[in-house]
Amino acid sequence: MKTPWKVLLGLLGLAALITIITVPVVLLNKGNDAAADSRRTYTLTDYLKNTFRVKFYSLRWVSDHDYLYKQDNNILLFNAEYGNSSIFLENSTFDEFEHSINDYSVSPDGQFILLEYNYVKQWRHSYTASYDIYDLNKRQLITEEKIPNNTQWITWSPEGHKLAYVWKNDVYVKNEPNSSSHRITWTGEENAIYNGIADWVYEEEIFSAYSALWWSPKGTFLAYAQFNDTQVPLIEYSFYSDESLQYPMTMRIPYPKAGAANPTVKLFVIKTDNLNPNTNATSVEITPPAAMLTGDYYLCDVTWANEERISLQWLRRIQNYSVMDIRDYNNSTGKWISSAAQEHIEMSTTGWVGRFRPAEPHFTSDGRNFYKIISNEDGYKHICRFQIDKKDCTFITKGAWEVIGIEALTTDYLYYISNEYKGMPGGRNLYKIQLNDYTKVACLSCELKPERCQYYSVSFSKEAKYYQLRCSGPGLPLYTLHRSSNDEELRVLEDNSALDKMLQEVQMPSKKLDFIILNETKFWYQMILPPHFDTSKKYPLLIDVYAGPCSQKADAIFRLNWATYLASTENIIVASFDGRGSGYQGDKIMHAVNRRLGTFEVEDQIEAARQFSKMGFVDDKRIAIWGWSYGGYVTSMVLGAGSGVFKCGIAVAPVSRWEYYDSVYTERYMGLPTPQDNLDYYKNSTVMSRAENFKQVEYLLIHGTADDNVHFQQSAQISKALVDAGVDFQAMWYTDEDHGIASGPAHQHIYTHMSHFIKQCFSLP
């Protein structure tokens, strides 16, 4: 379960947004300045119309020293060291195509470019599209042996220009762009058998991707997963489409709910060098380790260590036990050989393995060692070095902070992102550690621009000779290019200076990032504070909540969103709090909600609101809460708790009963809804059981009728329970909208409607 995608924007330094990271409440722009400030505020229209547009710099590395960047619809090739560019593909080249190009992908050898058009979105990551291949040497389209329309996924091999694609749930390989395709699988069937692509639950909850294809580093082998959903129950819902449609369409998706039959999975590998168009290709299955065969299991990661060594991670349905199985190719038999010494077990005794799944391994170039993020004995996620045939590993990082991700591995260094700097869980910085001396660690971003940039991500060139640093806040996004040998900044790629100048004329809110201590534990929060914030005044407070396991809402990212409008124009404080169950602060906090969803994370939001109301600047008669998805669930549970703290709240696309949500996500945290396992906590964590307490609050319930993720059923049952209890409440549905309610008209309508509700609740004009 994830929150709907929202545009993330930022502001330069103190000119547009002030971020305070401190323990005591800090006074900002106090008092008398407000009357003299004639600048306009950031309005709801500004948010809905995206009046202030941030610039991004999305490059694509094509080698260790060159990258592509699209500018004025020309695709330019840049040299990283010197910054000079040449036209890789002119805008005029696209004029000869019959279709509008949605995206492109260049073959690793630079000879061909794959052009995508007719894009049709399916679920969160999945889509279908049509493709043409352009020969860059001949400067012409390849017209023979074209890729079929409505292709579900396509990818180049890591070297050369082989192609693997999925069409009608079957896998195909092209060894040359202009040659005929080799059909690899023959079993594909809609809503039943998926080859090379994920079914709904694997796409949403395990791979976070549609692809289930994995090329070996040189393209000799192709691994692919097969999912069998024939026993998975279908979710069915109406899709109303145009008003001229007399009978609505019925959408059907194999969707395993908690405790229901899951898809089964198999993993195959095929050698692509010897494909013969006259004979069917032979795929070799790699079966799971014996420890997985005692019950249901998931395939959760596939990583190639080298050309003839593959790592598979398998996870039991009760997600506290996983096995990483490293297999080697036997040339004489064509089989992938297992060894007990090359099986690595990862377990959790306090919750589940990993943050959402076991982390992927990062292998050394010889494939003999790998680095992986796992929990240490203190429950913090850190990097451990493994030898492939040894059970124990050596931690190379440590501390009361967490490694977020391994970003690059070279002969001498490992690069990673962590939140170590200044003990702030909501920050992100880039570090490198010397592999022959783990005590030699350097932060490459911490002191570059600490006022503007405290939240970084990174993109490395093919062999990590260069990297792009991407600063997401608290100031405006800043993109810089660096040389790895000395970490020197070579140039600024984008600094959003034009936007900063525009925002000088707007009264922008400030952001406070701080913590409170509850039961001797630090819990972080953020507040978006109105312009000219004055601690002697009383402001209405809106809690913006998500609160799902391993979530984080208090961070150093700058956003231009609905909260910006509420603070700037309506003088509402918008706060978020990371309580028990939240992520990136150790397993003790994250696993507190294990098998207990709907308890501590709900209680902590209520307690946070109480603590905020004691700070002196919150009007305790005007406190509201709102959230989307898991946040909608927590909002509803909070309002149904009868605490007397909240006047009103908004729940968008909420879960209402955990048996209604998908198996992978729900069972990770709750186990199975059976009397032998955790049925009592399933029953005690429903919104409907709290219906009577909604008489004490004002409640707005919102859902899209075509939500494939959190089904409309969830809100329908809340509505039914409230009606049965005689509760007066407001509700809004959005016809044919999915979980994001993101189409243009619906997006504008929902935020306008919610704004009216909040203003009415707070008695604002």
From Swiss-Prot:
The organism's place on the tree of life at top rank: Eukaryota
Glycosylation sites: 84, 91, 149, 178, 228, 280, 320, 330-331, 519, 684
Any one Gene Ontology BP term: T cell costimulation
Predominant location category: membrane
Top-level EC class as recorded in UniProt: hydrolase
Disulfide bond residue pairs: 384-393, 443-446, 453-471, 648-761
Catalytic activity: Release of an N-terminal dipeptide, Xaa-Yaa-|-Zaa-, from a polypeptide, preferentially when Yaa is Pro, provided Zaa is neither Pro nor hydroxyproline
Gene3D superfamilies: alpha/beta hydrolase (3.40.50.1820), Dipeptidylpeptidase IV, N-terminal domain (2.140.10.30)
Membrane-traversing stretches: 7-29
E.C. no: 3.4.14.5
Compartmental location: Cell membrane; Apical cell membrane; Cell projection, Invadopodium membrane; Cell projection, Lamellipodium membrane
Active site positions: 629 (charge relay system), 707 (charge relay system), 739 (charge relay system)
Topology of the protein relative to the lipid bilayer: Single-pass type II membrane protein
Regulation: Inhibited by GPC3 and diprotin A.
One cellular component (GO) term of this entry: endocytic vesicle
InterPro entries assigned to the protein according to its UniProt record, in alphabetical order: AB_hydrolase_fold, DPPIV_rep, Pept_S9_AS, Peptidase_S9_cat, Peptidase_S9B_N, Serine_Prot_S9B/DPPIV
Keywords of this entry: Aminopeptidase, Cell adhesion, Cell junction, Cell membrane, Cell projection, Disulfide bond, Glycoprotein, Hydrolase, Membrane, Protease, Receptor, Secreted, Serine protease, Signal-anchor, Transmembrane, Transmembrane helix
PTM annotation, UniProt: The soluble form (Dipeptidyl peptidase 4 soluble form also named SDPP) derives from the membrane form (Dipeptidyl peptidase 4 membrane form also named MDPP) by proteolytic processing. N- and O-Glycosylated.
Reported function: Cell surface glycoprotein receptor involved in the costimulatory signal essential for T-cell receptor (TCR)-mediated T-cell activation. Acts as a positive regulator of T-cell coactivation, by binding at least ADA, CAV1, IGF2R, and PTPRC. Its binding to CAV1 and CARD11 induces T-cell proliferation and NF-kappa-B activation in a T-cell receptor/CD3-dependent manner. Its interaction with ADA also regulates lymphocyte-epithelial cell adhesion.
PANTHER family (UniProt xref): DIPEPTIDYL PEPTIDASE 4 (PTHR11731:SF128), PROTEASE FAMILY S9B,C DIPEPTIDYL-PEPTIDASE IV-RELATED (PTHR11731)
Quaternary structure and interacting proteins, as annotated: Monomer. Homodimer. Heterodimer with Seprase (FAP). Requires homodimerization for optimal dipeptidyl peptidase activity and T-cell costimulation. Found in a membrane raft complex, at least composed of BCL10, CARD11, DPP4 and IKBKB. Associates with collagen. Interacts with PTPRC; the interaction is enhanced in an interleukin-12-dependent manner in activated lymphocytes. Interacts (extracellular domain) with ADA; does not inhibit its dipeptidyl peptidase activity. Interacts with CAV1 (via the N-terminus); the interaction is direct.
Entry protein name: Dipeptidyl peptidase 4
Source lineage: Eukaryota, Metazoa, Chordata, Craniata, Vertebrata
